[in-house]
């Protein structure tokens, strides 16, 4: 089976990540593709059993943030026909999704209320059955695919913490069983389709993938290998292997993606939207992309698409803006001290590395749109901030 990969957008595929799914090293990413981390766990079953059902599990241990674009997936094949996968996504501020997709098929039936099935195109064609679910970090979700006769395979997802169960749908294939070979669990950061994306824009995530079991739990796979996407983000990934699971850690050293909140509970904001030169201001929290920050391992504070919080000078009253990160280090790391900030967990201040001065709400004015500045650190409420968590 040729490994193919359907991403969150039904009509979009990328060969670079697809080659990694069955253990083949991906090529260097093209310049027009963003640089994001990816990790893979490959499995094998002893004795090549005929599998009429397989159950996987995913526990997202720390939520990377509602504005994160991350896909946790279980890929597999059939004894006839092409491949499939199912998993869960965080969709960049849109509704979160469970999905089950099969290549080169044309018939599908929806499952539980709220699910739907649709065709997709791109690198081949197929069917995808989906359901929106605001899944919960820390809960273990099982994903079961089972033969239902006459080539139909159904996918069911269960939240083991609550007992809730959801059938995503049933898809007709030419197969009679699930292949015991070629199973891969992977984590994809699909901001790769943003040409500006870098390793340091991406939020930290860690997910526990339980080893697959088949035929009602009577056979269990083992981990045969692990790998990463092999790009500049590789050093920021880690896969921890145990007897019954792997934990895939990505964007290690970065925080999750979320709000930076300050005086009056208002948010650090890129005024009017994300772009180079935009004023950094205080504004009511909206959950928008212009308030979705990552505290990066290089000391920068970043919005999506490689934009950084930056000081325009070093003196008291110097303007603070959102600037192109323009990182020249590996993976887009920033070395410009004007774009680097130190967070004090005791004083709750954000201190600019170039000046040693604090991010400040001038005069304590909490009116929406108040432009932020640098000022000598004084410990006042107008210099205190809460930031996205690191783990």
Predicted feature locations:
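Secretory targeting and sorting signals
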Residues: 1-30
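Secretory/extracellular carbohydrate-interaction modules
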Residues: 31-117, 130
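Activation corresponds to long, low-complexity, non-globular regions
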Residues: 32-53, 57-67, 186-256
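Residues within well-ordered beta-strands of beta-sheet-rich folds
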Residues: 53-59, 140-146, 154-156, 310, ...
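Short, aromatic/His-centered strand-loop micro-motif at the edge of beta-sheets
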Residues: 118-142
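Carbohydrate-binding surfaces in secreted/extracellular proteins
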Residues: 135-167
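Flexible glycan-contacting loops in extracellular carbohydrate-active proteins
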Residues: 170-196
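Lectin-like carbohydrate-binding module/patch detector with strong preference for beta-trefoil
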Residues: 253-391
